[in-house]
Regions:
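Gram-negative (and chloroplast) outer-membrane scaffold detector with strong preference
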Residues: 66-149
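Predominantly the C-terminal beta-signal and adjacent terminal strand-loop region
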Residues: 102, 165-185
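Residues on the lipid-exposed face of transmembrane beta-strands in outer-membrane beta-barrel proteins
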Residues: 31-35, 56-60, 107-111, 134-138, ...
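Bacterial Sec-dependent N-terminal signal peptides
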Residues: 1-24
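Short glycine/proline- and aromatic-enriched beta-strand/turn motifs that initiate or cap beta-hairpins
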Residues: 19-61
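Outer-membrane beta-barrel channels and translocator barrels
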Residues: 24, 61-65, 114-116, 163-165
Length: 185
């Protein structure tokens, strides 16, 4: 009996018992709205030709500092050779413009600078945290009278998120998706 009690006293404190280990607390789903823009041959300013975009996401929280996010984004990409102030390439004398549907899917790793969460299982956690992310993605652009383009991209970005309550977050992020193709425009 003594051995059993001693073994329980040694092993029980080592057992991790926390709600954050339950799969339903580690996974999140969400939606987002924002703007999408393009910087390239026919747009030298990311603030020009901004278009609305919509996204859906799934996030898996490894711990209060690290997550993996899968997201799908839909928007429009617009550009025009009119009033372009970029140097390259040499533009033809005819005006060129495009308006394409854009679908982007990306998988990124997020790193929170402060432990993020609420409740007793997140000791020392904050409701607010800045974060950075990076990963890999794929983009499909179609429409506008041009052939469809499929390309790989490298998304990087930064943001801030705030935990409204145990089940709701509010986030704001800014990201760049570096396309590995010059055919989007």
């Amino acid at each position: 009996m003594r051995k059993l009690l001693l073994m329980l006293m040694v092993l029980l404190p080592a057992a991790r018992m926390s709600a954050q280990d339950d799969p339903q607390y580690r996974m999140e789903i969400g939606a987002g709205v924002g703007t999408v823009s393009y910087e390239g041959d026919f747009n030298g300013n990311v603030l020009k030709n901004m278009q609305p975009m919509f996204s859906a996401l799934w996030r898996y929280n490894f711990d209060p500092y690290k997550d993996l996010r899968l997201s799908a984004t839909y928007g429009k990409l617009k550009g025009s050779s009119k009033d372009v102030d970029t140097y390259y390439p040499d533009y033809a004398t005819e005006e060129y413009s495009f308006n394409r549907n854009l679908l982007d899917v990306s998988l990124v790793f997020e790193y929170n600078f402060w432990p993020y969460g609420t409740g007793r299982d997140y000791r020392g956690a904050k409701r607010l945290t800045p974060y950075i992310y990076g990963g890999i993605g794929a983009t499909s652009a179609s429409g506008g009278g041009s052939k469809s383009v499929f390309t790989v991209n490298v998304p990087i970005g930064l943001g801030v998120k705030y935990k409204l309550n145990e089940r709701m977050n509010l986030g704001l992020d800014w990201g760049i998706h570096f396309s590995l193709s010059d055919e989007l425009d």
